[in-house]
Amino acid sequence: MAKNRKTPNMNLPVWFDGQNINEALFCEEFLHERRIIFANGAFFTPDGRVTDDLPLRGEIYDKLKFCAVNNIPRKITNILEVLKLEAQVSDFPPEQDRIHVANGTLLLNGTFTEGRPAIVRSRLPVGYNPDAPAPVIWLNFLDGLLYAEDIPTLQEFIGYCLIPSNKGQRMMVIKGNGGEGKSQIGAVLSTIFGTNMKDGSIGKISENRFARADLEHILLCVDDDMRMEALRQTNYVKSIVTAQGKMDLERKGKQSYQGWMFARLLAFSNGDLQALYDRSDGFYRRQLVLTTKEKQVDRADDPDLAEKMKAEAEGIFLWAFEGLQRLVANNFKFTESDRIRENREAVKRDNNNIFDFMESEGYIRRKADASISSKDFYEIYRMWCEENSLAPLKARSFSDAMIANAGRFNLEHCNNITNSAGRRVWGFMGVEAVARPHINGFYDVSSCTYVPEDWRD
């Protein structure tokens, strides 16, 4: 259709007869002039997803304002609804092998194509400049914030967030005591990711079933100050970290739908990300936990540091892209230092004291041909907690945790254990009791401190 097509006998667009606007014809002409599609509940252009429709409304208004029609704002809204139908495509899957930047498209193999002719899901506001200088201020900042062996992991994770993929199956938590400047990372990343990054709350994601829909089309979600409370449920967080393709999303007052989810989670915190009930290894295995260096007492903070690092955005992008290429070459397995592994293990132990209990002495003994009932096992565990001033898990949580980690301790959960009364009950093969807290008849009294009545004065 020709641009600004006119009617044969009037100097007017074909979609306006002098009194009324034909929305369908207007949208047909608009799409002929403008590269835009509507898919997965959003408009997309060569600039990426339309996050604010006000500029789009402004374009429509510029074409309508000469028309003497009533209630133009409502007419614009109607046109937008028709435009969704006219520009509709069935699906718009993410492209995991390329990064669309301000001045072109960069493939994972390093090939760069200048220009932006195609409609894309996301386009980063940073440009690709292979000759950009090294981000000296950024690198010096990281050197003072993190241990040297942990910086490659951060480099790979930021690079991982440049593409719409969850193949890495990891989220990142950067933990410190406060005042180290770790949140400056989020400020710098906002310059690189633009509207493809969102400030959010992992706590909200875990407890609000509508929060996941807010992360649709987003590359990175940053929790700048993660709450210290343990998560009551972890399934929403785990599903985001491991999403491969579409997942079920829900918005208030609307029917749930299948949407693309590839948001990566990055949190800054003064503590660990813990679960209130989830003792599974999977929850902790998905965390990359980085600890910051202690802040030097004589360090002078630069209030303009974030702005100085933002000026190095092109160099930081090259640095992150190098990390992405290394991650892809390693089949999306992150570089992990011994410290990161120890951090993850420490978080797991802090939230689940069965590991320390199983390594204790004087309470149980691991033995291949031995067995113990679940009830006796839990009573010994309770005694161990009492004598070490620790809060015990509930009986069901203890059993679930032991079952989940049975392979680690060479145990077998079965229902053919014979208890002291001669009845067959549930229990574990591969462990025997050393302490026997129930012999004195007092559940919470340690057998180590019990004194028989006939010994007392």
Residue ranges and their predicted role:
Residues 1-3, 39-67:
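Modules that initiate DNA replication and primer synthesis
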Residues 2-39, 65-457:
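Feature primarily recognizes SF3-like P-loop helicase cores of small DNA viruses
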